[in-house]
Amino acid sequence: MAKSGYNASFLLLISMFLILLTFSNVVEGYNKLRPTDCKPRCTYRCSATSHKKPCMFFCQKCCATCLCVPKGVYGNKQSCPCYNNWKTQEGKPKCP
């Protein structure tokens, strides 16, 4: 009897883990762009800066790798973890 209770608990735990894993993949994929979406998103992202060329270069590079560009012209990087966590050798943010 104790063994069947253990098996049921184990199956419930595995099921909950798989459901959690599925939802985490759905949330992670929420910001996924197609590569063709990068240029228009970066054009808007870099629209408020006076350094448009470097902003566009790095934004498109980051978007090509991360397939995500944060909303707005500044900040909101927490919505794109890959974009947010990519740093230069000096430890500064690589993505605008």
From Swiss-Prot:
Induction entry: By auxin.
Record's keyword terms, sorted: Disulfide bond, Secreted, Signal
Compartments, record wording: Secreted
InterPro entries per record: GASA (IPR003854)
Classification via Pfam families: GASA (PF02704)
Post-translational modification: Six disulfide bonds may be present.
Keyword presence, Repeat: no
UniProt superkingdom: Eukaryota
Coiled coil segments of this chain: none
A cellular component annotation (GO) from this entry: extracellular region
Signal peptide: 1-29
Tissue expression as described in the entry: Expressed very early in lateral root development.
PANTHER family listed in its UniProt record: EXTENSIN, PROLINE-RICH PROTEIN, GIBBERELLIN-REGULATED PROTEIN 5
Protein family (similarity comment): Belongs to the GASA family.
Protein name: Protein RSI-1
Organism: Solanum lycopersicum
Lineage of the species this protein comes from: Eukaryota, Viridiplantae, Streptophyta, Embryophyta, Tracheophyta
Name of the encoding gene: RSI-1
